Structures are given as C-alpha cells and as structure tokens.
C-alpha cells in the first residue's frame, strides 16, 4: 500500500472509531478479532468431535430440530448441565410449557440455579430473550420451541383466522435485533425447532422447519437429530439409539454425523460413546466380547464395560482425553470431570 493510501486509511479508521467507539473496526491480526472460538460441550463426545471445535460455539445462534421424541430437549438439557459444571448461568424459555424439572435434574441440570420462563406469547418470549442477552450476565439461553412462539395477534384472534407469515416476520425481526448482541455478550442461544411437511412436493425432501427462513440464515450451527433404533435389555426398552447430523456449520466443516445412545432417566450414555470411539481410535482393545484398556480387561460385553467406566470416572476421563487428543479436539477440563464425579457420588 502506498503512503498516501495508508494515510487515508488511518484517517478513515480514526474517524470510524471516533464516531462509533473503540473496537468498531479492527484488523484481524490485532488479537481481539482473531480470538479462539469458545465452546460448550454437548455432553456427547461423538457430537463434540463431529462439530469440529469440541462443542457448540458461544456468541452464536444454534438450531436443533427433529421429529417428536427424537431427543431435542434432552440434548439441550445436557448442554445446560455441561455449562453449569463450568460455573455458567443458563436460562430456559419454555414456550411449550412442557419442561419436566425432575427429568432435567436426572440429566445433571442444577435446577435451583436454572432460570426458567413460561411466556404467554411469542413476542414476550423473544423480548425476555433480548433482555437476558443484553444483560451480559447469561452464558446460554434455550428457546423451546420456535413452533410454540405464537404471535400475540394469533392468540387474540379467532380459531379459524388466517394470518400467513406472521410467525416468520416475528422471527426475522427478533433475529435481526439479537444477533449482534449475542456476539458481543458471548452468549450461546439455542432454538429448538419442529419439523413440518411441505404439501405437494414431488421431488426432494418434503420436510421443513417452522418459523420461516430467517433462523436458517442466522444459525451458525444447525443440528438434525433423529431416533434410529431402540436399546433393549432383555425384552425391556431402556433407551434410544440417536443420530445427529451437523447440517450447517460456520465454524468447522459441516455434514459430519454422530451416533450415540440416550438412556431413559440418564440422558446421553457418555460411557457407551467412550467405549465405541475408543475402539475406533484403537485406544480401547476389543477381543470377542471382552473390552480392555492398557492391557487390563474392563468388562465382558458393552453393558459391563459401561458399568466399569461409570464406577471409575478417572479412567473414563483419561480415555476420553486420549480420544480427543487423537482427533485434535479440545481436551475436557478437569473441573468438569470432577463436578460430574461429585454428582455421581451424591446420587
């Protein structure tokens, strides 16, 4: 760059900073602009790896969608539990009025510390979200769900009234307001969404999500969660096998998948994932039905190996960190593991 251009650019930058404040424009190499992405673990080792950065990125909008009973709320409650283990504050905007507090506690959520709101209208839900984000004191907000964000005009109208595009306009306006503040306050905002079918689609995928297209554009990460099978113990169904596909990812390559078990009353089976991923990474050895680690047998069959890791959390954490290192994903902080152990002991 010539001296004249350099001088003109410096004058323009000085004018912008004077008008809009320090930090309104900066070079990418100045440090602040090139900070590493801070993440919150999903509670699933496989999903953390599939996301490429070790979890869900803070200061971003995330959308989780899927069919009914696929594990959407369970996954978000696991993320809240992981955040709370690190001392973070979370809020749950329960627009569906369906949060099971006892189930949340079973998943490891510190319920007394969780902020909860059950708004009457979509506008109220998004105003509360905006106020919480602007406070700068909240680390994570979950909105459950976009489909339940009913505009005030629809609630006050008659049952058969047709109000096309009202919810989409509401979401579009809210996201325009929220996105900048979310980035500035480093708050993770998760929108849970439902699936609908497009009528008359002959080719391609007939599925779509509610609330218009704005959320698809503003989301940095979109996760498609599906139940793909049942987990049985003898003849009793004890959980679901779940697949999550990273449909959109602005912080890492997209279209990766994670498959994990969700056990009823327990949530994501972290021990089961450690065993499966440990075998794939050749950190855990499998010979027939026996699993072994560092030459020592840890169980015959997956259920026994899972139980061994549950009883020996320090070995589970050691295997997990070795898996993360082998795949170049951030290691789990010791604090999170210690708090998880303390919670297991209390139970």
UniProtKB/Swiss-Prot annotation:
GO terms for molecular function: ATP binding; ATP hydrolysis activity; ATP-dependent DNA damage sensor activity; damaged DNA binding; single-stranded DNA binding. It is found in: Cytoplasm. It holds the Pfam family RecA. GO terms for cellular component: cytosol. Keywords: ATP-binding, Cytoplasm, DNA damage, DNA recombination, DNA repair, DNA-binding, Nucleotide-binding, SOS response. The keyword Cytoplasm applies. One of its GO terms (biological process) is SOS response. The keyword Nucleotide-binding applies. InterPro entries: AAA+_ATPase (IPR003593), DNA_recomb/repair_RecA (IPR013765), DNA_recomb/repair_RecA_CS (IPR020584), P-loop_NTPase (IPR027417), RecA-like_C (IPR049261), RecA-like_N (IPR049428), RecA_ATP-bd (IPR020588), RecA_C_sf (IPR023400). ATP binds at residues 66-73. It comes from the Bacteria. Belongs to the RecA family. Can catalyze the hydrolysis of ATP in the presence of single-stranded DNA, the ATP-dependent uptake of single-stranded DNA by duplex DNA, and the ATP-dependent hybridization of homologous single-stranded DNAs. It interacts with LexA causing its activation and leading to its autocatalytic cleavage. This is Protein RecA. It comes from Burkholderia cenocepacia (strain ATCC BAA-245 / DSM 16553 / LMG 16656 / NCTC 13227 / J2315 / CF5610) (Burkholderia cepacia (strain J2315)). The lineage of its organism: Bacteria, Pseudomonadati, Pseudomonadota, Betaproteobacteria, Burkholderiales.
């Amino acid at each position: 760059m010539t001296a004249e251009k350099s001088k003109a650019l410096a004058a323009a930058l000085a004018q912008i900073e004077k008008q809009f404040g320090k930090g309104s424009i900066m070079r990418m190499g100045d440090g602040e602009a090139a900070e590493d992405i801070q993440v919150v673990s999903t509670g699933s080792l496989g999903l953390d790896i599939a996301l490429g950065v070790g979890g869900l990125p803070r200061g971003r909008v995330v959308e989780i969608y899927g069919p009914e009973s696929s594990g959407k709320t369970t996954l978000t409650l696991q993320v809240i539990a992981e955040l709370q283990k690190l001392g973070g504050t979370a809020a749950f905007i329960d627009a569906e009025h369906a949060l099971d507090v006892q189930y949340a506690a079973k998943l490891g959520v510190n319920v007394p510390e969780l902020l909860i709101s059950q708004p009457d209208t979509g506008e109220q839900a998004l105003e509360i979200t905006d106020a919480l984000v602007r406070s700068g004191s909240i680390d994570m907000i979950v909105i459950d769900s976009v489909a339940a964000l009913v505009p005030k005009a629809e609630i006050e109208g008659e049952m058969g009234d047709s109000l096309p595009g009202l919810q989409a306009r509401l979401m579009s306006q809210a996201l325009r307001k929220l996105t900048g503040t979310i980035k500035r306050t480093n708050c993770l905002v998760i929108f849970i969404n439902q699936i609908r079918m497009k009528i008359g689609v002959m080719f391609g995928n007939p599925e779509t999500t509610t609330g218009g297209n704005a959320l698809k554009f503003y989301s940095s990460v979109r996760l498609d969660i599906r139940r793909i099978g049942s987990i049985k113990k003898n003849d009793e169904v004890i959980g679901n096998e779940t697949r999550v596909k990273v449909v959109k990812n602005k912080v890492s390559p997209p279209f990766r998948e994670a498959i994990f078990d969700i056990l009823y009353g327990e949530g994501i089976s972290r021990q089961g994932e450690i065993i499966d991923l440990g075998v794939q990474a050749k950190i855990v050895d499998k010979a027939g039905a026996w699993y072994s680690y560092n030459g020592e047998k840890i169980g015959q069959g997956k259920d026994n190996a899972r139980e061994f890791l549950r009883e020996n959390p320090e070995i589970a954490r050691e295997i997990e960190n070795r898996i993360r290192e082998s795949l170049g994903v951030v290691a789990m902080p010791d604090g999170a593991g210690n708090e998880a152990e303390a919670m297991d002991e209390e139970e």
